[in-house]
A protein has these predicted regions:
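Catalytic domains of carbohydrate-active enzymes, especially glycoside hydrolases
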Residues: 22-43, 110-111
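Hydrophobic residues within beta-strands of alpha/beta enzymes
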Residues: 37-39, 73-75, 115
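Active-site beta-loop-alpha junctions enriched in small/polar residues
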Residues: 12-16, 40-44, 77-80, 120-122, ...
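Glycine-rich, proline-tolerant flexible connector loops at the mouths of alpha/beta enzymes
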Residues: 38-66, 119-126
Length: 159
């Protein structure tokens, strides 16, 4: 059992070596005396593929978490940079929402309670009133989906 009076300190995944698997990463987090690690699901194919991890892969990570006492309470989800929820392209918006669903289900399976997401409607496209409208509509859907899994969506502060 964790000491509720202890200050918990975590580390962002991208501050750790990239060339190790998740079980090794979790052990390293523990060795470095951190209590938790934040996982990144960015716009790269490699990290987006995590949303399709099998139950066996997830169970292997769960075992490492239990064995070490390390947690993964949050996800930085920036896959929407490449596939924005406010895109003028309907196919891109559909992909964005597919990724959002996968991220929520993945979070639920992993025990992740919070998904930080970008607060912009589009990134590589020109923003407009229409892209903002699409983003707002899709964000409302995403909030409903997340709430049904008891996952919190938070908007990351953007420059």
């Amino acid at each position: 059992m964790r000491d509720l009076n202890k200050l918990n300190l975590g580390i962002y995944e991208k501050a750790l070596p990239k060339d190790i698997d998740w079980v090794e990463r979790i052990r390293l987090v523990k060795e470095c005396d951190y209590d938790f690690v934040e996982i990144s699901i960015d716009e790269t194919d490699e990290r987006l593929a995590r949303l399709d991890w099998t139950n066996d892969e997830i169970n292997r990570i769960h075992k490492a978490l239990i064995d070490t006492g390390v947690r993964i309470p949050s996800m930085c989800f920036s896959g929407h940079r490449r596939f924005p929820m406010g895109s003028m392209d309907e196919k891109i918006r559909e992909k964005a929402m597919e990724l959002m669903q996968k991220a929520i289900i993945f979070a639920d399976k992993m025990g992740i309670r919070t998904i930080q997401m970008a607060g912009y409607d589009v990134y590589y496209e020109e923003s407009s009133e229409q892209t903002k409208k699409y983003f707002t509509e899709n964000l409302k859907k995403a909030v409903e989906w997340a709430s049904s899994y008891n996952v919190t969506l938070s908007i990351e502060i953007m420059d």
